[in-house]
């Protein structure tokens, strides 16, 4: 029990469970004995009915639309906390990770488009390598233990949170189709109710969650991706402490283990099961997976390093205390771990077009993410001196 408690207390535990879930999915999807069961599980229909309102989706879509909304609720809470009290609370603190994140989104997207611009279908996946899997990246960094300067951990977390915020904006602007104005109207009313609750100082988290369920349903029916409802709810839950208690921090504390040890691993299990049948070197080096691999493995560190260098040269920001530029470059490589966020965007980009494209995209994401994890970890291990 002591070893189990030590494992779950480690920052690396969430990343390790993610890896196990992804490997298990790959094994089951490629085994004759279990592939049928794996796909049957994902296609299991689940129906929710309240009066005349009916939501009928398969298990995969419930995981991607409902459970991931809880993940984005946690992201919303984290972003709000960092903006108001944490590493993004002042312009001086926020400048370096914000500039790094912008470079880490622009350059991978441009590199992907360099491979895929001529194809109007695969071009839609330009945002896939712009994402970073915060849990996976922090998990890999945690494997290095106490050698990692606290400032470097905070930099990676701030960068990844801004990256997540960028991904949310991208999803809202570029991966939303066929809008239902009636449902958007209901969503607008729900958001207004959340704002009133916040302004009136209501601190009962359950009330916000209840309105959040209405908002999630309306957003789902509107054509906008339902996970955005989670972020909106997270922004409205009060952060300010009263009698030593903060509703937002308390909910963040409650949600974190559920997201790290259940929701993200379940998402990885449901989405990482790519069949390798028929996969060839020619296929893996075709424009879609190659663009993703190049974006994650080259574009991410290049964009982050280049924009950080420009920020330092132009005196727009300064290095976090106790870190070196070489360490920042290594963190840039770790940000190439797109994994769950990249898979999520790939499912939005190609889900209604061609399932085969999603498979090739997932292969590119897995190769790019694993390569980034191994290279980033190795580089940091060399660059960080053991603590005495």
UniProtKB/Swiss-Prot annotation:
Disulfide bonds: none
Top-level taxon: Bacteria
UniProtKB keywords: Antiport, Cell inner membrane, Cell membrane, Ion transport, Membrane, Sodium, Sodium transport, Transmembrane, Transmembrane helix, Transport
Reactions the enzyme catalyzes: Na(+)(in) + 2 H(+)(out) = Na(+)(out) + 2 H(+)(in)
Pfam families, A to Z: Na_H_antiport_1
Transmembrane feature ranges: 12-31, 59-80, 97-116, 123-130, 155-176, 181-200, 205-222, 224-236, 254-272, 287-310, 340-350, 358-380
GO function term, MF aspect, one: sodium:proton antiporter activity
Membrane topology, as annotated: Multi-pass membrane protein
Main location: membrane
Single GO biological process annotation from the record: regulation of pH
Location(s) in or outside the cell: Cell inner membrane
Gene Ontology cellular component terms for the protein in this record: plasma membrane
Membrane topology, Periplasmic segments: 32-58, 117-122, 177-180, 223, 273-286, 351-357
Positions in the Cytoplasmic compartment: 1-11, 81-96, 131-154, 201-204, 237-253, 311-339, 381-388
Function per UniProt: Na(+)/H(+) antiporter that extrudes sodium in exchange for external protons.
Family affiliation: Belongs to the NhaA Na(+)/H(+) (TC 2.A.33) antiporter family.
Protein name: Na(+)/H(+) antiporter NhaA
């Amino acid at each position: 029990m002591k070893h189990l408690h030590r494992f779950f207390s480690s920052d690396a535990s969430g990343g390790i469970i993610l890896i196990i879930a992804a490997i298990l999915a790959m094994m089951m999807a490629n085994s004759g004995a279990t592939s049928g069961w794996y796909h049957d599980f994902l296609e299991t229909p689940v129906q929710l009915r309240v009066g005349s309102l009916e939501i009928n989706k398969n298990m995969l879509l419930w995981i991607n639309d409902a459970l991931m909304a809880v993940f984005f609720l946690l992201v919303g809470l984290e972003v709000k906390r960092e903006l108001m009290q944490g590493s993004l609370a002042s312009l001086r603190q926020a400048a370096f990770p914000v500039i790094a994140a912008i470079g880490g989104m622009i350059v991978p997207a441009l590199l992907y488009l360099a491979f895929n611009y001529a194809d109007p279908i695969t071009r839609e996946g330009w945002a896939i390598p712009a994402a970073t899997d915060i849990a996976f990246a922090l998990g890999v960094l945690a494997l290095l233990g106490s050698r990692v300067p606290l400032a470097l951990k905070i930099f990676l977390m701030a960068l990844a949170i801004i990256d997540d915020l960028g991904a949310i904006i991208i999803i809202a602007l570029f991966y939303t189709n066929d809008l239902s104005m009636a449902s958007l109207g209901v969503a607008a009313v729900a958001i207004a109710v959340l704002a009133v609750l916040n302004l009136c100082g209501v601190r009962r988290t359950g009330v916000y969650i209840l309105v959040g369920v209405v908002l999630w349903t309306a957003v789902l029916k509107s054509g906008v991706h339902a996970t955005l409802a989670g972020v909106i709810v997270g922004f409205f839950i009060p952060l300010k402490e009263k009698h030593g208690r903060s509703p937002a921090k308390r909910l963040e504390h409650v949600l974190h283990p559920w997201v790290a040890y259940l929701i993200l691993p379940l998402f990885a299990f449901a989405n990482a099961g790519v069949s390798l049948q028929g996969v060839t070197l020619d296929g893996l080096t075709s424009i879609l997976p190659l663009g993703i691999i190049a974006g994650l493995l080259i574009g991410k560190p290049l964009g982050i390093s280049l924009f950080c260098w420009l920020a330092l040269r132009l005196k727009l920001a300064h290095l976090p205390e106790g870190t070196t530029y070489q360490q920042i470059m290594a963190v840039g490589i770790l940000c190439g771990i797109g994994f769950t966020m990249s898979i999520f965007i790939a499912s939005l980009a190609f889900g209604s077009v061609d399932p085969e494209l999603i498979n090739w995209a997932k292969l590119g994401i897995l190769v790019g993410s694993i390569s980034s994890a191994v290279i980033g970890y190795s580089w940091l291990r060399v660059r960080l001196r053991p603590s005495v």
